[in-house]
Amino acid sequence: MPSDLEKPTIIYPCVWDYRVIMTTNDTSVLKELLETYQRPFKLELKNTSKNAKFYSFNVSMEVSNEAERNEIFQKISQLEVVAHAL
């Protein structure tokens, strides 16, 4: 298990990328969540599974600090249409 000394140094604010695997290609719920942060974001469809069961999106947005970065990750992960977030 990595120690705190091995954690990468991240300088905030910075643009952070999240990979979001969803069960629908309708991004309205995800966009609604991201818009609550009142800053620009980029949302791109990256991949669709062979049977169109899952859709992979890349979300990029500026985060102010580690706490905010983790909060956004948690909120994205808790959306009903999200199968997995990275």
Swiss-Prot record:
Alphabetized InterPro entries for the sequence: UPF0250_YbeD-like, YbeD-like_sf
Pfam families: DUF493 (PF04359)
Domain of life of the source: Bacteria
SUPFAM superfamilies named in the record: YbeD/HP0495-like (SSF117991)
UniProt family annotation: To C.jejuni CJ0253.
This protein's name: Uncharacterized protein jhp_0447
